[in-house]
């Protein structure tokens, strides 16, 4: 099991918890109360800085209930936090766009992350044909 260093920006932040067997994703919460109006953009502080192990990155995504509960969208789809973002002041944040007026309470679980190994080194080879069947285009299962 890997040990990950986490700096909390407040003593009353709920500590991160990995629940084996339940999900590979770890919830993150708003570090402060945030009030947004429809059309607002804001970087919501998540109250943690994390020293990822070398060779790893984190993928940050909204929880499935985030839009239903708060009407916010994560503006960069899935956020990617790389290994080098590990300083004492490198607090993780969730970039959001508000679709309606909302107040997100401090401690509300709004997003989740997982840690994944970096992509291996790749080399691309130019070819005239790939050799596989066409599936029918973008958005098609090929059926």
Enumerate the language-model features and the residues they cover.
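DUTPase catalytic domain/fold
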Residues: 1-143
